[in-house]
Amino acid sequence: TELQVAELLAGQTPSRPWRMDAFVPATGVASTAAGAGIFGRLVLRAGSQPAGFRVLQDTYGAADAPTAPVRRLPSPVSVDLVQDGNALIPQTRIPIAGSHPYWEFVFGVGRTWQEPGDGEWSRAALPFSLMEVNANCLHHGVLTFVFAPAGRISPVAYQVSSETCAYFKADLWGFLQAEFMDVTTPEAGRVVEARRAEIDGRLPRRPLAQLADDHPGSSPAEFGHPAEVTPWQMSTWGVIVDGVHYSGGCPTRAGEYPFCEELVLPSYSVAKSVFGGLGLMRLERRFPGARNQEVVDYVPECAAHG
């Protein structure tokens, strides 16, 4: 892995972002199960050194000021973690509200492992997203750290390199100070069982390119076509055919997102459309013919507006 134990322990922010594959087991390197378990509360705090921040799009000038809140992460933030095999499961996977005026953390399921030469240290990585407060844009990142027995933990390296936001795009990277607290997690069993049930309930997932082999005559290249969405603004895409999820991947500005199945996506107008449709179906079920009724017949004040 590009991020070596010594670099994580030193916690010095580089001048440019890492590649996303630095946050997961190195390709071609025989990784093993983590030498130590990790159960308890991870507390993250902003470090004393400047973090990396690079703006690509800022339509409304959110980052114009050097001290703008959008330039810093929420601090402190904590998440209770449960381990199931090599899976590292946050007890809370919904937005974590706090006092930060711009960002809320959303954590996904990560993993633990160990690589040759790590010695007593084990590695952990967690996908996360930063959700804009009172908005729906999501900025996707990954964090990683090493840990050892007796609660020892390195600074946490983090990086954000993609988003679902048209008006604000930025790379964020650096280190957070970390503390691991040995707290009891009464809901650990339930969290693990819920995660296992979620995995069991997922559709089979295959690369989008395999669609052409499974369904001759289909054209995978038509999905996520550059004529429809600019490639560098694409978060993910795919199609479901015969109960199989064909995924186009999760590209970022720093390489493929290493936890594609954990990518948190906003609903935007999908939620409003689904809500309205479900509401109308319920209304029609209770009052057959309701979908063909005119509102003006029940609200005379609407007559003047047709």
Say what each PLM segment does.
Residues P266-G289:
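Active-site SXXK
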